[in-house]
Amino acid sequence: MHYCVLRTFLLLHLVPVALSLSTCSTLDMDQFMRKRIEAIRGQILSKLKLTSPPEDYPEPDEVPPEVISIYNSTRDLLQEKASRRAAACERERSDEEYYAKEVYKIDMPSHFPSETVCPVVTTSSGSVGSFCSIQSQVLCGYLDAIPPTFYRPYFRIVRFDVSTMEKNASNLVKAEFRVFRLQNPKARVAEQRIELYQILKSKDLTSPTQRYIDSKVVKTRAEGEWLSFDVTDAVHEWLHHKDRNLGFKISLHCPCCTFIPSNNYIIPNKSQELEARFAGIDGTSTYASGDQKTIKSTRKKSSGKTPHLLLMLLPSYRLESQQSSRRRKRALDAAYCFRNVQDNCCLRPLYIDFKRDLGWKWIHEPKGYNANFCAGACPYLWSSDTQHTKVLSLYNTINPEASASPCCVSQDLEPLTILYYIGNTPKIEQLSNMIVKSCKCS
């Protein structure tokens, strides 16, 4: 027994001290870049649920203005969000995600006060009754006082009163919009892709009227289900700017108009109706008249399922303590990771040109982006006489293929908004975690 104890003791002390450099496999910078480029290729296709790049089609001479407006407003929102974090010396709120948060539920009200009506919009043909005109009037930011249950075949408008939460605006951690999709047995299509937009208040008809948030594919005839959307940025904006609270728009993924560059005409498309039905938004009038069985069933399934917001806020005392803690951490890391010339773990610049580096022509905007990557050695920060070092040395001896020391990995990442084409159809998507902003040893 004493022999075994002595043997273990000697083993712990005689094993060489862990190396000062990371045991993670090392690569030269060219290899790092090639691997990063290939990883981005797979990441983009995977996030778009594509097994291979779309077939090459001739690029349009000009992208429709309404598509560019949506892309620009979504891109600007992400840039504003990143700028706010940088100015406040903030990271992703990993600490706040750990602690308990106060949750508030805000139900959709049945009515909103009357506001200024939109100016009449006409197309090149002079028509004001097309879907394009109607949509422009509803989305221009000056909404009529009509109840949410007013039936619109192509889209739905949802609004919320968050004025009671304005005093806690800085405490907002996350906001979720939840809406219950009802089963629609009479739907003409079995599946539709619905999109959620934030309605913007525009000063004129050239300004964007909506900002893309997210999309989901739903089965219209299937059993009902809750749909959740992250609307943190929109609600945060409403809490700080009350006049910008114009609600959300739920619509189909299809352009309402076709823009012809040669003569600047806008031709309204025959849009597919929104077959998905939502509790608390779609009244019984959306179903066939006289079908009392369907109406009764719909009312029962809609009970207690009003569209609502779930707001998660940190208590003020906890937010203050965590903000000071977070800023101290940022200051410590900044000097280590962002030197111009450094062999240790730090952020390395890498610009991806979609055509040059990936051979892709189907992404229209942006032409490329700063993807960046993390590389460098991760020295141990503990001394050689600590028991922790000895345990790691023993572990490294028993598991020579494993990494007992930290590796240089990404820490803060930001999303990327892209405008791309599938055939002749423009699409706008927000890809999460595409831009590396800082690194750490982990």
Curated annotation (Swiss-Prot):
InterPro entries registered for this protein in UniProt: Cystine-knot_cytokine (IPR029034), TGF-b_C (IPR001839), TGF-b_propeptide (IPR001111), TGF-beta (IPR016319), TGF-beta-rel (IPR015615), TGFb2 (IPR003940), TGFb_CS (IPR017948)
GO biological process per UniProt: activation-induced cell death of T cells; ascending aorta morphogenesis; atrial septum morphogenesis; atrial septum primum morphogenesis; atrioventricular valve morphogenesis; axon guidance; blood vessel development; blood vessel remodeling
Disulfide-bond pairs as recorded: 337-346, 345-408, 374-439, 378-441
CDD domains: TGF_beta_TGFB2
Keyword Disulfide bond: yes
Tissues expressing the protein: Expressed in cardiomyocytes.
Protein name (Swiss-Prot/TrEMBL): Transforming growth factor beta-2 proprotein
